[in-house]
Each structure stands twice: as C-alpha cells, then as structure tokens.
C-alpha cells in the first residue's frame, strides 16, 4: 500500500523524475561499461542493486521535497480502500451462494 503511495508516477508527480536525468539510460550505459571491464559477475549484481537503491532514494526525496497536498493522497488511498472493501463483499457473497448451491445439490442427490 505504502509502496504504491511512494511511487511518484502513481500520485501523478512526474516532474521530479524528469528533473533528474542522472538515473537515465545514459548514466546506466556508462556505468555498465565500467562494470564490465573491471568486475566479476557477483559484484556487478551488487553494484546494480546499489544503483537502483540510490535512484529510488533520490526519487523519493524529490517527491517529499515538492509541496504536495496530503489530502489528495488520503483521498486516493480512501478510494482504493473502498474499492477493496466492495470487492471483498462481492467475493464473500459469491462464496456463500456457491456453498448454498452445493448444499442444495447434495440434498437433492440424497433423496
């Protein structure tokens, strides 16, 4: 739930991501060449994960520093919760009907 809230695209905040071209493809490409020439595969994997971590960290700090109205986030989360509740209700109802139908079938077969 929170992961979705922290993802900038989901909240409609895309400007902060565009502002930082350092985590773009050009940066990755230069990094890749440096890795391939100097490191064995295991360290390469570790480095890529570190890079990912730093990229996400910068993105999150970017979104936090930007003034965004908290009510909007709350509204979106609220709607998500409402949707989930509705789905659950529907699911439970369907399950109950199925069970009742199965019971009726058993009763009719027993006769």
From Swiss-Prot:
* Pfam families found in the cross-reference section: COX24_C
Q: Where is this region: Disordered?
A: 82-111
State the UniProt keywords alphabetically: Membrane, Mitochondrion, Mitochondrion inner membrane, mRNA processing, Ribonucleoprotein, Ribosomal protein
GO MF annotations, alphabetized? structural constituent of ribosome
What's any GO biological process attached to this entry?
mRNA processing
Q: Which cysteines are joined by disulfide bonds?
A: none
- Basic and acidic residues: bias regions: 100-111
Any Gene Ontology CC annotation: mitochondrial small ribosomal subunit
Say where the protein is mainly found: mitochondrion
The record's note on quaternary structure and interaction partners says: Component of the mitochondrial small ribosomal subunit (mt-SSU). Mature yeast 74S mitochondrial ribosomes consist of a small (37S) and a large (54S) subunit. The 37S small subunit contains a 15S ribosomal RNA (15S mt-rRNA) and 34 different proteins. The 54S large subunit contains a 21S rRNA (21S mt-rRNA) and 46 different proteins.
Q: What is this protein called?
A: Small ribosomal subunit protein mS38
Please tell me the species this chain comes from. Answer: Saccharomyces cerevisiae (strain ATCC 204508 / S288c)
């Amino acid at each position: 739930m929170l992961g979705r809230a922290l993802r900038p695209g989901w909240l409609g905040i895309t400007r902060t991501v565009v502002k930082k071209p350092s985590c773009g493809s050009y940066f990755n490409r230069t990094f890749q060449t440096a890795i391939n020439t100097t490191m064995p595969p295991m360290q390469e994997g570790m480095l890529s994960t570190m890079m990912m971590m730093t990229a996400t960290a910068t993105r999150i700090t970017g979104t936090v520093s930007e003034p965004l109205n908290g009510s909007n986030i709350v509204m979106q989360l609220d709607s998500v919760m409402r949707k989930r509740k509705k789905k659950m209700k529907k699911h439970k109802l369907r399950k109950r009907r199925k069970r009742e139908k199965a019971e009726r079938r058993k009763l009719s077969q027993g006769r």
